[in-house]
């Protein structure tokens, strides 16, 4: 069995660092990095350094655009027209793509951040407009999304390749949606690792309602801003390796 392991990277801004500031150490355990592109976190120099590090470690990179919300770290919903949101996302994609192009690193994927990710999971107008633009711009760019979400369905309809995600450090409800929160709590590394292995081997995750939910996915996501993220990533990777599950990029 093979699985992708992704995490959000480069979510610092100038002298400010999000979470435990463990990007450098955590990147050794993953196969794909979602690099913040300046609107919810990140700045040009941080983006450049994160690309350099990913290149050294052989980690694939993707754009991680968010709402224009530095203060709220992109976790606050912004009620903007679909065209404005797509303009902002393409602007952020272009910024990362050029910084990566200088270093000869191709972009593997595109993954919206936080509240924008959840918005596109539900809003068909914005999701369809984004995918239509990606089809014109980069029809082979992988789109990371929640399985069964609006944007996942639209992308599959229009032919944009998708990578369905499983969230190692977020709770699920019976609808199959992650339970979005602005107050991220710490997790026990052994419990997270066991949850991931169960999802990989059995295709099941326990929901907040206490029932099992069947889930299909291509990539495991673990957030670098979760308290204790490095220990979570290390425990998860060790569990995957121990179970004979190969961690590699989706293509």
Curated annotation (Swiss-Prot):
InterPro entries listed in its UniProt record: Glyco_hydro/deAcase_b/a-brl, LamB/YcsF/PxpA-like
First and last residue of the signal peptide: none
A GO molecular-function annotation: ATP binding
Source domain of life: Bacteria
EC number: 3.5.2.9
Pfam families (alphabetical): LamB_YcsF (PF03746)
Keywords: ATP-binding, Hydrolase, Nucleotide-binding
Reaction catalysis annotation: 5-oxo-L-proline + ATP + 2 H2O = L-glutamate + ADP + phosphate + H(+)
GO biological process, one term: carbohydrate metabolic process
HAMAP family with a match to the protein in the record: PxpA (MF_00691)
PANTHER family, per the entry: 5-OXOPROLINASE SUBUNIT A, UNCHARACTERIZED PROTEIN YBGL-RELATED
Protein family (similarity comment): Belongs to the LamB/PxpA family.
Function: Catalyzes the cleavage of 5-oxoproline to form L-glutamate coupled to the hydrolysis of ATP to ADP and inorganic phosphate.
NCBIfam families given in the database record: PRK05406.1-3 (NF003814), PRK05406.1-5 (NF003816)
Subunit structure, as described in the record: Forms a complex composed of PxpA, PxpB and PxpC.
Protein name: 5-oxoprolinase subunit A 2
């Amino acid at each position: 069995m093979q699985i992708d392991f992704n995490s959000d990277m480069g979510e610092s801004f100038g002298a400010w660092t999000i979470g435990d500031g463990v990007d450098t150490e955590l990147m050794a355990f993953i196969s794909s990095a979602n690099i913040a592109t300046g609107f919810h976190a990140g700045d040009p120099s941080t983006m450049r350094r994160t690309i350099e590090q990913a290149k050294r470690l052989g980690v694939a990179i993707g754009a991680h655009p968010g709402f224009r919300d530095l203060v709220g770290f992109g976790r606050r919903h912004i009620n903007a027209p679909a065209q404005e949101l797509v303009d902002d996302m393409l602007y952020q994609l272009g910024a990362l793509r050029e910084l990566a192009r200088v270093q000869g690193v191709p972009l593997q994927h595109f993954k919206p951040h936080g509240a924008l990710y959840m918005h596109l999971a539900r809003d068909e107008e914005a999701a369809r407009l984004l995918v239509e633009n990606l089809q014109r711009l980069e029809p082979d760019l992988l789109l990371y999304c929640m399985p069964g979400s609006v944007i996942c369905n639209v992308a599959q309809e229009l032919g944009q390749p998708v990578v369905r995600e499983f969230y190692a450090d977020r709770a699920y409800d019976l609808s199959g949606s992650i339970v979005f929160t602005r107050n991220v709590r710490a997790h026990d590394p052994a419990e997270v690792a066991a949850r991931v292995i169960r999802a990989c081997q059995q295709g099941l995750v326990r929901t907040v309602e206490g029932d099992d939910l069947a889930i299909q996915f291509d990539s495991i996501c673990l957030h670098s801003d979760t308290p204790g993220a490095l220990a979570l990533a290390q425990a998860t990777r060790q569990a995957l390796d121990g179970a004979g599950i190969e961690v590699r990029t989706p293509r």
